[in-house]
Design a protein with these regions (language model features):
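N-terminal, active-site-proximal structural segment of metallo-dependent hydrolase catalytic domains
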Residues: 1-164, 175-179, 378, 393
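Structured beta-strand-rich core segments of catalytic domains in phosphoester-bond hydrolases
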Residues: 73, 80-84, 93, 141-143, ...
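Solvent-exposed, polar/charged alpha-helical surfaces in well-ordered, non-transmembrane soluble domains
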Residues: 128-136, 154, 158, 188, ...
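Active-site environment of divalent metal-dependent phosphoester hydrolases
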Residues: 149-151, 181-186, 246-248, 287-293, ...
Length: 393
């Protein structure tokens, strides 16, 4: 008989590969990501006006794609121009600085192509340590943030998360729905054999066309509590999310985007409650603090409860009060969440932050981490994992 379920949330910061730009200092990375997003947006224009062409050339210059289409072997290159059909640019041969490059395509119909971010493979020890975090947390259901895609996540679990007694995958149920992020930073879920997914629903299309609410998605994953438990046959819904980042600056547009995402997630949650679903978890990386205006619709204006209020609660640092979930775990870095509906909060019997996969400080000495992490680049993630136990007896 299943007497307890453990649920976790973990931003793995990609499993096998990650955009090279994200390894740069934040101002550099933010500029590259903005240029990448904007130039692809301009490519979709029906007509390339002189102003559009001028902006394209400036963005391609910032991405170092004026003189050629990019070369992944050059460590200073962060993007590649993919050209499938037609011609976008005229590049004179004797033009070392690219000042003579022109846009010759008249609009979207004249050519097919886009700009991709170059990805680098993640350190092998970091990958192994990511698996170790998930194994040691020991959750039955894990909400995953920043996974490349379903096949990558399945390959990760099938090779690194095996039952030592049977050699079977600990998490045979793996799902990632491709979201709205072009960089391959999606959200997904893992579950054990005792908790197969009953159904799922995506929210990638919430909002008007061209103005999607969610940066990735807010998928609903539905499960049934197992036979023999106190909640046998009843439904459990897990919502996984990754709100707009503060990366590159917390400007008013960024705050407004997160608030809109928070409000939409709250609306999805409230609709489920109205439909009679009692047992709901909302989790993920919300990229803002509990006192932020952006998260108010979700944290204040619903009856969801943060697991930080569950007792006993282990913050992952035996010596300090460390409520944060990112980096050094300070109060201002509490950006990851695991929220419970009232019925689940009433059954919660313990929760915590698992930060042994995080480096912590300049020298990795702020709090205990795995002995297999000998340098910062070997850390599993900059994010700690969150977990909660729910009594099913």
């Amino acid at each position: 008989m299943v007497q307890q379920i453990r649920i976790a949330s973990y931003n793995v910061e990609n499993l096998f590969s990650r955009p090279r730009a994200l390894n740069q200092p934040e101002p550099v990375a933010a500029a590259i990501l903005r240029a990448h997003a904007r130039v692809n947006e301009l490519f979709e224009q029906e007509v390339y006006t002189p102003a559009v062409k001028a902006e394209m050339l400036q963005l391609l210059k910032e991405l170092k794609l004026l003189r050629d289409d990019g070369d992944a072997t050059r460590t200073s290159t962060f993007a590649i121009l993919r050209r499938i059909r037609g011609r976008l640019l005229r590049r004179p041969q004797n033009d070392p600085d690219g000042s003579q490059v022109t846009v010759v395509a008249s609009g979207r119909s004249a050519w097919t192509g886009w700009v991709d971010l170059i990805k680098d493979r993640i350190d092998e020890k970091a990958i192994t340590n990511t698996a170790r975090v998930i194994r040691e947390v020991g959750a039955d259901i894990v909400g995953i943030v920043e996974a490349e895609d379903r096949l990558t996540l399945a390959r990760f679990t099938d090779s690194l998360l095996l039952d030592p007694a049977t050699a079977d995958p600990i998490y045979p149920h793996v799902m990632v729905i491709d979201g709205n992020d072009p960089r391959g930073i999606d959200v997904g879920i893992l579950s054990t054999a005792a908790f197969p997914m009953a159904r799922m629903r995506s929210h990638i299309d919430d909002g008007l066309f061209g103005d999607r609410v969610f940066s990735r998605d807010c998928p609903e994953y539905w499960f049934a509590f197992p036979a023999g438990s106190a909640l046998a046959g009843q439904q459990l819904v897990v919502l996984v999310n990754h709100f707009k980042s503060k990366f590159g600056g917390n400007n008013p547009a960024s705050v407004a985007r997160r608030k809109r995402q928070s409000k939409q997630t709250a609306d999805i949650y409230n609709a489920l409650r109205t439909a009679g679903v009692e047992h709901i978890v909302v989790l993920g990386d919300f990229n803002d603090t509990p006192d932020s205006e952006a998260l108010r619709p979700l944290l204040v204006e619903t009856d969801l409860t943060d697991i930080a209020s569950v007792q006993p609660f282990d913050d992952g640092d035996p010596d300090e009060d460390r409520p944060g979930t990112f980096g050094n775990g300070t109060r201002s870095s509490k950006i990851d969440y695991l929220l419970l509906s009232p019925s689940l909060r009433a059954r919660a019997n313990g929760a915590g932050i698992f930060r042994k996969g995080v480096w912590g400080g300049v020298n990795g000495t702020l709090f205990p981490h795995f002995d297999t992490i000998e340098a910062e680049h070997q850390a599993a993630s900059d994010h700690a994992a969150l977990y909660v136990g729910i009594d099913l007896d």
